[in-house]
Amino acid sequence: MAYSYLIVGSGLTGATIARQLLDAGKSCLVLEKRPHVGGNVYTRLVDGIHVHQYGAHIFHTNHEALWRYVHRFVHMNRYTNSPIANYQGQLYNLPFNMNTFYQLWGVRTPEEAQRELERQRAQAALAHPPRNLEEQALQLVGRDIYEKLIKGYTEKQWGRPCRELPPEIIRRLPVRLTFDNNYFNAEYQGVPKEGYTALIEKLLDGAEVRCNTDYLADRAAYDALAERVVYTGCIDAFFDDCFGPLAYRRVRFETERLEMPNYQGNAVVNYTDAQTPYTRIIEHKHFTFGTQPYTIISREYSAEWKPGEEPYYPINDEKNQRLYQRYQALADKRPNVTFCGRLAQYRYADMDVAMEEALRTADELLRS
């Protein structure tokens, strides 16, 4: 056969696996349906600004080895994710911390904040376990935070009332009794100075990459080219949606250049009221501390997904999980195909988790 491995998808998972296989002397053909590599971490250089084409991506990890691995290919900056929430024109720091509590209630000490949190939690006390997301959130943080910073944003994100969403979506909500706006607790955090596309291109260096190529459109011909297949696309599509499609949410972006040096003063601002149609605005230059006299922003809208559109977030409710398990049972009967990545495994994964799992998968492939 012409190649040792056929890798379907050039996102973070596929590219990381390719790098490990290539370093072990294996030949790889990578097929990408989109006109560019990188999947959803793809960044496009526009007028000197790296635009996160599919939404904000901030790499974070507690594992030094993974941080060093990424540094083999790109230079990571020291960007720290400190998003802001805009509720009806009022600004609040995220995650929920002493700055947030001061902005909400005027409290200045952890003791005052804890007392108010406990008071509001007690008001929301239930005689039964939380049955939906609203009850869960009220139990965790009380009504003020729920109404201003969770409810509207979450309902826009998922397209349904919080009372109809499962409580498992927010198993926990971090509450910090310190003045700390760092969203992630990870020891290492940053964004590639050269953009994420540069990272993907370095990971894929040495592989044959074919963009604008739909593996599923001519599967038999592509399978004949390699000894083994690594598939990172939608698992239901692989099996021709034989049990019906899995459900996702999609995201739509409106991106524009503005002739001003600074639009919102922060990379990410969430709009948490129900009246604002978009969920957040991203100002891309702030990810890499840009100083250009202009800026580029993206408004992010969450919407229902239909087959043929780009899937973003899996809807991991009970119905879809049962459906996924049926597809997984079919995948288990394909020993020559490795299914990995967020779409093939129907779950959300942070970038560090995706890369670590890709590294483990590559190691297993090389040992098999």
Show where each model-derived region lies:
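Dinucleotide-binding Rossmann-like beta1-alpha1 core, especially the glycine-rich loop
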Residues: 47-123
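Glycine-rich FAD pyrophosphate-binding loop
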Residues: 22-47
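Mid-domain catalytic core of redox enzymes
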Residues: 216-330
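N-terminal Rossmann-like FAD-binding beta1-loop-alpha1 element of flavoenzymes
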Residues: 3-30, 362
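Short loop/edge segments at beta-strand edges and connector loops
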Residues: 9, 80, 209-215, 341
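C-terminal catalytic lobe of FAD-dependent flavoproteins
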Residues: 310-368
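Structural/interface elements that position substrates and couple domains in central-metabolism enzymes
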Residues: 69-72, 145, 264, 276
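Active-site/ligand-binding neighborhood in enzyme catalytic cores
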Residues: 88-92, 98-228, 232-234, 239
